[in-house]
Amino acid sequence: MRSFEFFEHTADVGIRAYGKSLEEAFSNAALGVFEIITDTSKVKPIEYREIYLNGYDLENLLYKWIEELLYYYDSELMVFSKFDLMIDQDSMTLEGKAWGEKFNGKIHERRTVVKAMTYHQLSIEKTENCYLITFVVDI
């Protein structure tokens, strides 16, 4: 199973992320966002940021997850390539670590800046075999 793919969207970028678990799908959604920013295969998981979030539903939790990661990119130039997280659907909380390193222009390719997560076309579906997350980011 592929981890994520991009789809056409006027002036923005759409992402479809897949995972056998909800946590894997959220991780792959984040990986897709950072793949827009740089080549994540060159991002070493050297340091991490702990993340604790709560939401009112899964879509809101995903929105906050991506926004939190983009906050670290905007404020610290952190780019991420590995994610360890747990999602509790009863309390609608996410707890985890995002692993990566500070962006270094000598190592990391500068691609497109992701400005923000959006609610446009945001959906989280559970199929028989996997979770599918669809969303659009503003570039």
UniProtKB/Swiss-Prot annotation:
Q: Where does Ca(2+) bind?
A: D12, D138, I139
Q: Which InterPro entries does this chain map to?
A: Archease (IPR002804), Archease_arc (IPR022952), Archease_dom (IPR023572), Archease_dom_sf (IPR036820)
According to the UniProt entry, its GO molecular function terms are: calcium ion binding
Sorted alphabetically, which keywords does the UniProt record give? Calcium, Metal-binding, tRNA processing
Q: Which GO terms describe its biological process?
A: tRNA splicing, via endonucleolytic cleavage and ligation
| Keyword Calcium among record annotations | yes
What span is annotated as the signal peptide, if there is one? Answer: none
Checking HAMAP family in the record gives: Archease_arch (MF_01222)
Q: What does this protein do?
A: Activates the tRNA-splicing ligase complex by facilitating the enzymatic turnover of catalytic subunit RtcB. Acts by promoting the guanylylation of RtcB, a key intermediate step in tRNA ligation. Can also alter the NTP specificity of RtcB such that ATP, dGTP or ITP is used efficiently.
The record's similarity note reads:
Belongs to the archease family.
Can you say what this protein is called?
Protein archease
